[in-house]
C-alpha cells in the first residue's frame, strides 16, 4: 500500500507562522506568514488539491512588519490575527545640540537612534478580500498574479502591556472572543462591531521574581471554553477565563524553556507540552506532580506540538533538528484499546477476536519521521478539513504537506 509523496511549496522569504483556515471544513487550506526585514511581508493562502496532489496559492501583503504568529477565526473564514514586529525610532533635531557642533551632533543622533530604536511586537485582526476566503485556482508558479492587501479590522492595543507573543481564539465560539499574551500579561478581548473594535474585557498578570514572559498559550475546547493554558519559562499554568485566576501550575514542566502546548481534543484534563530540553510531555492537569508520558525523539529544541483534532492518539511535533515526527500515543488516548464496536455488531466468531484484542492497551510508537526540511521546523499543524493531512513549515520558507500513512489510517478506522 503505497503512500502519496509529500508536496512541497517554497516561499521566497523566511517564515515561521502557520495556521489552518480554521473555519473552513471542506477545502484543505493553510495560511503562512513571512519574516522579511528588507521587503514587504506576505501571507500566503495555500490551497491543497488532494485529488491532483497540487498546491494553488494566493498572496496577501502584510506591510506592517515581519510575522511571528498567525491564527485564524474559528467562525469566519475571512478573518485572521497576526503578531508582528514594529520598529519605533527616536527622532532628534540638530538644532537642539547648540554649540556641540554639527558633526558631533550628527554622530550623537546616529548613536542615539540606533540604541533607542525600539522593536515592539504588536497584534492586529485582519480581513482578507472576499474573493479569497474560499480559495484560489492559481498555480504556484503564476508570477503574473499581483498580491492583494489585507483590510485592517482593529489593533489589539498593547502599549501598556509589552510585546505580544500570540493571539488565540475561543475554539468553539463565534469569533468574538480572543486572548492575547503580552510579556507577563494575559488579556481577554471582546471583538465588537464586526471585529472592527477590540475591547479589553479582563486581564491578569504573572507575579514573581525576574522578568516573567509568556511564550505560548492555548484555549481549551473543554469546560465550556472557560480555561486557557499558558507557558512561561519552564512553567505551565491554567487560567479560568471567567475570573482570570490561576487554577493549576506545573512548575519545572521542562528542564528548559517551554515552547508550545496543546490540549487533547477528546480528553478534557490532558495536554501536551514541548520545549528546549528536546522533550514532549503529556500531562493530566488533575495530578501535575509528574507527566503521564514523555517522548524524547528529537535532538534539538521542539517548537511545536499538535494533537489531531479527531484521532487524539496522533500527535505531531516539529523541531529545529529539521525533522517532523508523527507519534501514535494510543495508550493515553481516548481509545487506548483501539476502535471498539458495539456488541450488537459483532458476530460470535468476531467476538473472540475482539476479546483478545481488548485485553491490553495498544503500544505507543513513532509512526513516521519526516525529513523533507533542511532548516529548523518552527510550525506544524493539522488540516481543519482533512484529519489525515498536515503541514509543516521551516524557517527557509519551505512548506511541506504530508499525510498519515494509509496503513495506519485504515487500522484506526477499521
Curated annotation (Swiss-Prot):
One Pfam family hit: Beta-prop_EIPR1
Annotated compartments: Golgi apparatus, trans-Golgi network
Gene3D superfamilies membership: YVTN repeat-like/Quinoprotein amine dehydrogenase
SMART domains: WD40 (SM00320)
GO cellular component labels: EARP complex; GARP complex; trans-Golgi network
UniProt keyword terms in alphabetical order: Acetylation, Golgi apparatus, Phosphoprotein, Repeat, WD repeat
BP-aspect Gene Ontology terms: endocytic recycling; positive regulation of endocytic recycling; positive regulation of retrograde transport, endosome to Golgi; protein ubiquitination; regulation of insulin secretion
WD repeats (start-end): 159-199, 209-249, 253-293, 297-337, 372-412
Residues modified to Phosphoserine: 347
Superkingdom, natural source: Eukaryota
Composition skew (Basic and acidic residues), residue ranges: 349-362
Residue span of region Disordered: 337-362
Main localization (coarse): Golgi
Entry function: Acts as a component of endosomal retrieval machinery that is involved in protein transport from early endosomes to either recycling endosomes or the trans-Golgi network. Mediates the recruitment of Golgi-associated retrograde protein (GARP) complex to the trans-Golgi network and controls early endosome-to-Golgi transport of internalized protein. Promotes the recycling of internalized transferrin receptor (TFRC) to the plasma membrane through interaction with endosome-associated recycling protein (EARP) complex.
SUBUNIT field: Interacts with two multisubunit tethering complexes: EARP composed of VPS50, VPS51, VPS52 and VPS53 subunits and GARP complex composed of VPS51, VPS52, VPS53 and VPS54 subunits. Interacts with SNAP29.
Protein name, entry field: EARP and GARP complex-interacting protein 1
Organism: Pongo abelii
